[in-house]
């Protein structure tokens, strides 16, 4: 799920071969509300056929983190060199490298 256009989402999926890891895609155009409303995250969980307790959101923006918090979905805030002035206080964990999201490191949260 991304608030980006489906064209952008498809480009990223194709470039990185992500299709095999996801059961569907949702873009901002598919929604009535935008972040920080949790609609996009709840729809993604529903599309995946998963209970929100089994889901994790990786977000790099204040609005995305707030949306995850409002949806009661575990949120890993991704802090990069390109994200500035974001509020990570509502995230469950803050990471600066995707290696920090390995199953062995985050399984204690589920």
Per-region residue spans from a language model:
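Conserved phosphate-coupling serine/threonine residues in phosphotransfer and NTP-handling enzymes
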Residues: 2-4
């Amino acid at each position: 799920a991304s608030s980006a256009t489906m064209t952008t989402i498809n480009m990223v999926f194709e470039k990185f071969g992500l299709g095999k890891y996801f059961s569907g895609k949702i873009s901002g155009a598919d929604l009535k509300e935008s972040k920080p409303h949790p609609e996009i995250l709840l729809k993604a969980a529903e599309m995946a056929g998963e209970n929100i307790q089994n889901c994790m959101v990786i977000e790099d923006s204040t609005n995305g983190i707030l949306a995850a918090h409002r949806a009661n979905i575990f949120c890993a805030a991704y802090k990069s060199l390109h994200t500035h002035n974001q509020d990570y206080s509502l995230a469950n964990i803050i990471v600066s490298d995707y290696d920090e999201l390995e199953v062995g490191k985050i399984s204690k949260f589920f």
